[in-house]
């Protein structure tokens, strides 16, 4: 499989990862271990990936793992087609912990909180990791494939 510059750099420096290929726009997707994510994130920022375009999370399969996905862009003055890379960090449902990248890209704030709220991934060292969409009293993670929808409906008075 063809590898991009980042994958080649990680191989050269003996950082365990897996290339997941390229999308239709030629953007490489890499799978990174959760324990390596904070140091790789710093490397990417130093290299010039100064913009976290988006972060999301999803449940891979019932009984399977959870994934946190980061789309990073290297924005430079005078460049019409900036470099991009996609990073996927997979964790098991029984201990879904990933280092937060809030301290590198501040735009990760609400995005990591939403991933925590909907999928249940805890982002270590996030300064305000709490629910952002659901009430604090909500039980469970609504976007997990094994989530059971509560069987209750609040009756509202029309007056």
From Swiss-Prot:
Keywords linked to the UniProt accession? Chloroplast, Membrane, NAD, NADP, Plastid, Plastoquinone, Quinone, Thylakoid, Translocase, Transport
Q: Where in the cell is it found?
A: Plastid, Chloroplast thylakoid membrane
Q: How does it sit in the membrane?
A: Peripheral membrane protein
**NAD: present as a keyword of the record?**
yes
Q: Which pairs are disulfide-linked?
A: none
**What is the similarity comment for this entry?**
Belongs to the complex I 30 kDa subunit family.
HAMAP family per the record? NDH1_NuoC (MF_01357)
This chain belongs to the protein called NAD(P)H-quinone oxidoreductase subunit J, chloroplastic
Q: Which gene encodes it?
A: ndhJ
């Amino acid at each position: 499989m063809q590898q991009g510059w980042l994958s080649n750099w990680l191989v050269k420096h003996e950082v365990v990862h897996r290339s997941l290929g390229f999308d239709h726009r030629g953007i490489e997707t890499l799978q990174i271990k959760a324990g390596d994510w904070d140091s790789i994130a710093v490397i990417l920022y130093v290299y010039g990936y100064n913009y976290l375009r988006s972060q999301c999370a999803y449940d891979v399969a019932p009984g399977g793992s959870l994934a946190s996905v980061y789309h990073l862009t290297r924005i430079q003055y005078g460049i019409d087609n900036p470099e991009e890379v996609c990073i996927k960090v997979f964790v098991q449902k029984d201990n879904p912990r990933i280092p937060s990248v809030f301290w590198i890209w501040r735009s990760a704030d609400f995005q990591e909180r939403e991933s925590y709220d909907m999928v249940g991934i805890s982002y270590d060292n996030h300064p305000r990791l709490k629910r952002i969409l659901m009430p604090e009293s909500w039980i469970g993670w609504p976007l997990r494939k094994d989530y059971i929808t509560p069987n209750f409906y609040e009756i509202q008075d029309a007056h």
